[in-house]
Amino acid sequence: MTTEIGWWKLTFLRKKKSTPKVLYEIPDTYAQTEGDAEPPRPDAGGPNSDFNTRLEKIVDKSTKGKHVKVSNSGRFKEKKKVRATLAENPNLFDDHEEGRSSK
């Protein structure tokens, strides 16, 4: 019994492999394009053209996804712009206040 190796040693003490696992594969259409060339797009007149334009707007790389939030369900939601508050613009209603006080 002392010469046998415990099952927990076989499970937890394995050496890690030096080669990393491939998490995803690059599709052939993207592998063939070089540099900043745009990937081929589907027909603009197709039924999903509205969806594709919205998706391109969301995935626009110039904004780096700062205006997009991913919900717990995995859907992309666009963040709404926050309006300026009175603390940021204290002189916003000064003209209106002066008009009332002169009456």
Swiss-Prot record:
Pfam family, one: ATAD4
Compositional bias ranges of the Basic and acidic residues kind: 53-63, 93-103
Region of interest called Disordered, as start-end residue ranges on this chain: 28-103
Family classification: Belongs to the PRR15 family.
Name of protein: Proline-rich protein 15-like protein
Species name: Homo sapiens (Human)
